[in-house]
Curated annotation (Swiss-Prot):
Biased composition (Low complexity): 12-37
The UniProt record lists the keyword RNA-binding: no
Membrane topology: Single-pass membrane protein
Superkingdom of origin organism: Eukaryota
Residues carrying a glycan: N82, N149
Transmembrane segments: 116-136
Name of the protein described by the UniProt record: Uncharacterized protein DDB_G0277605
Region annotation Disordered: where it falls in the sequence: 1-37
Subcellular location: Membrane
CC per GO annotation: membrane
Amino acid sequence: MDNLKEKPLSYNINNNNLNNNNNNNNNNNNNNNNINNNINNNNFKYVSFSESLEDIGYQNQYIIDKDEDYYIQEQRYIRQNNQSDDEEDFNNNNYEDSIKISLIQKSFIKNKKNKIIITTIVVLLMIAVSLGLILAWQGVFDQIHNNNNNSKDE
């Protein structure tokens, strides 16, 4: 009892805070151990901060341009649970390839509209030129025919 009287009130408060901190630290350590056990037991596939869920197996369908109605299905690389962790089975090159493919498809789609318009114009010009040539030759033949008739009449 004498010891309690000698100690100031703040001592008991500080002591309680220390005990609470120790309990919190123990709980945090237990939680971390559970997470590590899950990772080691393959219940949870570890994803680094540089990867997103899309990188490891999300299939995304999206519109390339808001003003166009073209959809491109971008297939991301999927790692199944039974596959090994070798670099050949899973790396970011597959993801980069899918991005490159979708960019090529995007430029192709944009060029496709332009190609159709240009092709239509070229075909119409060719038809006009061919009709012009036909009419010109027709005029030449008519003139020759008329000249022949005129020479016979004389």
